[in-house]
């Protein structure tokens, strides 16, 4: 988490209000991420073969510190999933990254993270790019295919 304590407290308050409308799986808590969660984010990302958090950790950490919403799902003390979004707060929220530990899938954690993002900004649409293996999950959450996504990476 960045050093802006006021912003962190505001995010916690916003999330508390949003979570009043979210059904959480048993034993799962969703909270605002902190820098201490970054190694767990790297672990889960690595298991998905996502290179940025491990090959470019400084850039990835910076992205997490400057994104909102940036949430983790925890079971006890263990981070079992995360979502990082980017929003204008009015029209669109882009889900930049979301992953659930493979051993924890099927419990409703991903849906709860997406619902938390939605209820933080209930008038925005949620946009994302999906890998083929996750399409059925997103469709079950109410998403629809709209266009073919594209990406150009510089590293």
Which residue ranges define each predicted feature?
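Conserved acetyl-CoA-binding loop-helix of GNAT-fold acetyltransferases
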Residues: 100, 106-119
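Helix-loop element at the rim of GNAT/NAT acetyltransferase active sites that forms part
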Residues: 32, 43-55
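Conserved GNAT acetyl-CoA-binding A-motif
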Residues: 119-131
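Conserved acetyl-CoA-binding loop of GNAT-fold acetyltransferases
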Residues: 141-148
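Conserved beta-strand in the GNAT
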Residues: 72, 78-87, 92-94, 99
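A short beta-loop-alpha structural element at the N-terminal edge
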Residues: 28-40
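A short helix-loop-beta-strand connector motif used in the catalytic cores of GNAT acetyltransferases and
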Residues: 61-72
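Conserved active-site tyrosine of GNAT-family acetyltransferases
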Residues: 138
